[in-house]
Every structure is written in structure tokens, then in C-alpha cells.
Amino acid sequence: MGNEASYQTELCNHFDQEEIRRLGKSFRKLDLDKSGSLSIEEFMRLPELQQNPLVGRVIDIFDTDGNGEVDFHEFIVGTSQFSVKGDEEQKLRFAFRIYDMDNDGFISNGELFQVLKMMVGNNLKDWQLQQLVDKSILVLDKDGDGRISFEEFSDVVKTMEIHKKLVVFVEHGQEDLKA
């Protein structure tokens, strides 16, 4: 993992050195096989993610090198987006990337369907979910191109103040992550 103290300046993240030290301790606790990276199974040990149907998408976004695991560098960069000191734009971009599965800068009808399906499971029939997706695209797609841009997404999500809910607290004296 290297010297945790160097990560603050190296990564331009929003954590101070003490927070990075505590995150390092949490990371090592999660890294059961001591490989220096977290598998999806190890990542799922975070209580906040155990019941989250989007955990796979979160890991995909954290895993910037695409190797299927999250190393300490990716862990710090990923969790830094949720720091109380993180800016609204970063949090909105993260939320957008949950839906933008192919990372092309737009949320398509199919991508919205896939992500919502992860969230609702079998609670809605596919045709009901598709109606919801179609209506959402119709309402959110201001330029009429059939997909949702980051700007269109942000216009709606900003009014919900979701960025204030996308926060990780690194508490003093407690080594667990809180979301």
C-alpha cells in the first residue's frame, strides 16, 4: 500500500493525513487475503454496501484500471468523492456514472433500464419499468436526442440536493466507514 501519509498530496483528495491513516486501517481490515486490493466479496463487507443493489456499479467506478478489484489508491480516490469537503460537481458526476454504464457521457434508455432494474429487482414487471424509463427520458431529455446528458441529469438532481447525502464520514476513534 505504500506510505499512507503521501496519499493526501499525491492524490489531491479531500482527506487529511489522519483520515487517510484511518481509511488505510479500514482498507486493511477489509482486505482479508492481504492482496493489497479489495475483491467484490471483500468490498461487500462494508455494512453500507451489503444491501446496496448498485454495489457492482460502485466497484466498477472505483476500479479505474478495470482489473476487477479496488486497490488502496483507487479506494482513496473513490471514497474521496464522498468526503464532506468534496464538491457538488464530483458527487453529481459519480451519481451520473452509476447510470452511464458505457461511460460515453450520456444515459441511454437501455442504461437507465438496467440500473433501475438493479434497484427494483422483480418488484416491477419489465414492461412497467420500461414505461417508467421512457417517461423519465421524455421528461429529462431537454434537447430531444433520446438520452440524458450530464447537464440534463444535474439540472434535476441538484434540486434534490443529493450531493449532500453522498458523504462518507471518517470519524475520530472509530475505524469504520460511515455513509
Curated annotation (Swiss-Prot):
Ca(2+) 4 binds at residues 141, 143, 145, 147, 152. Ca(2+) 3 binds at residues 100, 102, 104, 111. GO terms for cellular component: calcineurin complex; cytosol; mitochondrion; protein serine/threonine phosphatase complex; sperm flagellum; sperm midpiece; sperm mitochondrial sheath. Pfam families: EF-hand_7. SMART domains: EFh. GO terms for molecular function: calcium ion binding; calcium-dependent protein serine/threonine phosphatase regulator activity. It comes from the Eukaryota. It is found in: Mitochondrion. Ca(2+) 1 binds at residues 31, 33, 35, 37, 42. Expressed in osteoblasts and bone marrow (at protein level). Expressed in the testis. Expressed in the sperm midpiece in a SPATA33-dependent manner (at protein level). A lipid is attached at residue 2 (N-myristoyl glycine). Keywords: Calcium, Lipoprotein, Metal-binding, Mitochondrion, Myristate, Repeat. InterPro entries: EF-hand-dom_pair, EF_Hand_1_Ca_BS, EF_hand_dom. Its main location: mitochondrion. Regulatory subunit of calcineurin, a calcium-dependent, calmodulin stimulated protein phosphatase. Confers calcium sensitivity. This protein has four functional calcium-binding sites. Forms a complex composed of a calmodulin-dependent catalytic subunit (also known as calcineurin A) and a regulatory Ca(2+)-binding subunit (also known as calcineurin B). There are three catalytic subunits, each encoded by a separate gene (PPP3CA, PPP3CB, and PPP3CC) and two regulatory subunits which are also encoded by separate genes (PPP3R1 and PPP3R2). Interacts with SPATA33 (via PQIIIT motif). This is Calcineurin subunit B type 2. It comes from Mus musculus. The lineage of its organism: Eukaryota, Metazoa, Chordata, Craniata, Vertebrata.
